[in-house]
Amino acid sequence: MIFVLLSAVLLGVFTYSVWIWSYFIRKGIKGPRGFPGIGMLIQTIDHENPPFLKYRDWTKQYGPVYGFTEGPQQTMIISEPEMVNEIFKKQFDNFYGRKLRPIIGDPEKDKRVNIFSTQGKRWKRLRTLSSPSFSNNSLRKVRNSVQECGTEILWNIEQKVRKNEDIDMLIVYQEYTLGVISRIALGQSESNMFKNPLLPKVQAIFNGSWHVFLITGIFPPLAGVFRKMSKMLPASFIPAFKIFDLIEVAVQARIDQRAKDEIKGVEPGEPQDFIDLFLDARVPDVKILSGEANEDFAKSSVVKINKELTFDEIIAQCFVFLAAGFDTTALSLSYATYLLATHPEIQTKLQEEVDRECPDPEIFFDHLSKLKYLECVMKETLRLYPLGTTANTRKCMRETTINGVNFDEGMNIQVDTWTLHHNPRIWGEDVEDFKPERWENGACEHLEHNGSYIPFGSGPRQCIGMRLAQMEQKILLAQILKEYSFRTTKNTQIPVKLVGKLTLSPESVIVKLEPRDS
């Protein structure tokens, strides 16, 4: 009897797995298939063979629209600008969710949901409360912290230059971005660069956890089990959970300090970092734990946004700004360094602009808008190396049809950003060339608005921290290029080897920094 029941259960599971796996076959949509129950999940969480480059290869094989399964999830890959623009902007009300791995949690109900993961009215509230942190006024306030972190980096570079050492700038930039975000997001008074115990923990988020993605990708209900057991699991199992614990300590310490100040009659004053900003919007947890439904999200623009954040949401926002601000900015700087080192004539032109527009040792906020060619260099860098493809996803919240392609409710959409940014029909036959001049005088500005160029995403869910990232990049590059030139060495990987499952990362960017006064 037990054998019969077990056989029936296994047959039912197998039949269900085959039914899910055959979804795109039944739809008549091409794509790689994999195996029932797994689909292409293993291929899309491979660190050494980045999934973003697999999307590129599959697009060449199957065309600009194709699909596959990842465990029980269906994912459609697209690389046509018109369809990207339709999904990210014009039909945003049908695609306001993101593709999420099960381990992330429920975007509607999870207490520690963040602005990247959540959707609907809850996303709108978090977006509204977070936006002031990235206004020009706020960026001016944190500019000094960014500059000071850059000065620390220059001191470290100087020590290595004196020893005539090659430098892996990827590691240097990770120290820099973690130093910046630790000060402006976590309220640390010092950056602790090159001795920050948080660095390996944050690195592990992007380099590890493949086993968790695989297990929970095949069996989503286990995600909830892992989350509840997070306190008992080793730090290496799910690194992000341990960082939550560290942030919780920092937030609680700020709350305790505010309570002491209130007793003494000390006013909190202007917010100095993200924790202050979010605490100013905090209310008792009970007021919003019930959540809000997302029906008629198209009409939600007229709904009043309540300034409410729970303790858990504050922790979640600090975490996502830490993780996103650490990796993507460091990678952008790394790719720019690689491209400048391998294109010395472009580097010289950029240095001439920096010398002309930033004559003082300090890089002020108003200098940044004058660095037009630097802006072109960074745009071209992110065209050639679209590192944040993971964020260029959406989830269909309501069945719809675009250009004859049907999107069912619950389907995930992933943009093949590499193909989009390397399409010769869009960018011309010199598409593989590093050519910042293509961006001069607004020549490619229209491509930033029609779905052809999306390094920071597009539409209402475009990266909220984009301007902070750009400020960090410009200030540090200007600081370095005033003093040094990047030079390739025998240890420089040419072409650069690409790795990563969450972001597209160079394995290393080893260069020599040559003092300009030499």
UniProtKB/Swiss-Prot annotation:
Q: Which cofactor does it need?
A: heme
Sample GO molecular function, one term: iron ion binding
Residues that hold heme according to the record = 463
Q: What is its EC number?
A: 1.14.-.-
Keywords, comma-separated and alphabetical:
Heme, Iron, Metal-binding, Monooxygenase, Oxidoreductase
Q: What class of enzyme is it?
A: oxidoreductase
Pfam families, per this entry? p450
Q: Which family does it belong to?
A: Belongs to the cytochrome P450 family.
Q: What does this protein do?
A: Cytochromes P450 are a group of heme-thiolate monooxygenases. They oxidize a variety of structurally unrelated compounds, including steroids, fatty acids, and xenobiotics.
UniProt xrefs under PANTHER family = CYTOCHROME P450 FAMILY 3 (PTHR24302), FATTY-ACID PEROXYGENASE (PTHR24302:SF15)
Mind telling me what this protein is named? Answer: Putative cytochrome P450 CYP13A6
Query: What species was this sequence derived from?
Result: Caenorhabditis elegans
